[in-house]
Amino acid sequence: LFDRLFEAQPTELAELEEFAGALLNGKNELDSGLFCQIYQALLSRARHTKDRNAIIRYLYWLGIGRHNMCAKMVGIDLADIEYYMSQMRLCFAEAAAYLKYFDEIDDVETKGYILRSRANTALGQFKSASAKIRVIKQTLQILQDKEYQKNAPELPWDRYLYMTHQQMASSISYNRDNDMTAQDVVTIMESAHIVHQQRITESLNKQEAPPIRTAFSCYAVEYYCGLLTLEELLGRIEKLMNQVDTSSFSLENMYAAISLPAFYCQYLREYPEQLSKREKYLENLYPKVLSYAEAFPKNEANEQIFFYLRQLSTTFIETPHSISYGDFQQNIMIHFAPDVYVHSQVVGKTTAILCDIILLEEPNFFDDIEQIRAITNFDAKRQAVYDFAMNCGVLHDVGKINFINLFSRTARQWFDEEYEITRLHTIVGHKRLDTCASTHNYAAAALGHHSWYDGSHGYPETYKRLACPYRQIVDVVGLIDWIDNTLNRPWLYGHPKKNFEEIIQEALSLEGKRFSPLLTARLRDSSVLEHIRQTFLSA
């Protein structure tokens, strides 16, 4: 259909939109990349035919698709993802700009898309909470304008207002260095209480449990207003988390079971003096989170639970007796991304074997790593290198948790934009490993395993090989990661299927460019090569 899109009949276009709707329908995400491709093509056609109603509708849905991609970027600094946020916001801003033609547009559905696009310009990350709040306030003013309401009385204005108040209630900043004005806090408090009271009414009418999410929003803003102490706020969050129905995977329960712990940890990160009093609670909380997540039905695709897991992966705090961050991440991968988990285990084991071979030949090879250099007993040093290499390999791809749907559910080659987005897994993986004591030393492997030895290609630019004391092990992880991906996932990267021998020959052709000559020299040793081959097979 794409080949003759400009000649397509209205019924065919409607069928294409229906197909796209099944790819991304809110709760389920089958293929958001293809969803965006379809709406980008439909938008081009609508621009060509100058169909204003279609342009507005397609801009809205393309923005929704791009927002879905942006939602995967939780935990990544705005500077690294501003381009993607701008691409999303431009779609909504262009559609919202048609507000000036609101009076002359006859189609009520199109008017609805204009208003929804206006509200959605506040989606995603902003440089400050105040900037986001300002955009939402402007939307509220538009939605409360009687002239607009009179012009389109058929639209669900109350619903639009409620959703925008909900957006405002979730805009509070949780940073210790508060970037909100006093008026910002007042505005958020008004919206939070409006939403909470409506949710209480709805839950009573439906005979449901009291709302948890909106209660937290109220508590958070009351804390910022000085109505609650931090201790009282944390205590109330604990009570909300204790209300989780572990047998239910409703949005409310998923929020309470996984997202609330993320906010709880964020407060403890911002106020570490509170941590000692709550270590025991935190240590008991993580197993509950994992138990709940692992019970999630495997045949269901719910992007919301992945979003909440990304939140908790970003704010996770280790304590002396809690599950380690590395183990927490591996538990998530086993359940939700088993292919990524297996790949990481293979890379870890093979990296450790190759590093052991190198160490036996050159005992000082890894001495740029301070803790390795400090070990004088060779047997102890050998074990330390093996363990270090294993952990670097096992954890090098933790950033892929942000892009679970792309790495584990897409049985097709990626689109160019998806290739670009998945490169962010190195940045987010590095950031997360770097913040926890048990994984800090392995962060370089997450950042640098896609860089090239000579620096001519690869990513990210923030990895500076010569300045990294872990570069020798990062080089090994990068080589083994490439071999395994080329061997077992060529379709994902658009490569033809190759056998092990062909892949090794290709690696040798990249000697001194992509791969360190110190490593490729080992690939010319038949005994070493056979050892690596057998490790791949057994792993």
What role is predicted for each listed range?
Residues 1-346, 350-354:
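Non-catalytic interface/linker regions that flank or bridge core catalytic/transmembrane domains
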Residues 106-109, 154, 370-393, 433-478, ...:
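Histidine/acidic-rich helix-loop-helix segments that form or flank divalent-metal centers
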Residues 294-420, 463:
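Acidic/His-rich, divalent-metal-binding segments that scaffold phosphate/diphosphate chemistry
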Residues 343, 396, 425, 449-450:
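Histidine-centered active-site/metal-ligand motif
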Residues 345-356, 418-434, 499-515:
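An active-site-proximal "capping" alpha-helix that borders the catalytic cofactor pocket
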Residues 353-357, 401, 432-436, 483-489:
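Signal-transmission/dimerization alpha-helices at domain junctions
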Residues 399-405, 454-458, 486:
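Short acidic/His/Gly/Ser-rich catalytic and metal-binding motifs that mark active-site loops
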Residues 413-414, 491-501:
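Short, charged, surface-exposed loops that flank catalytic or proteolytic processing sites
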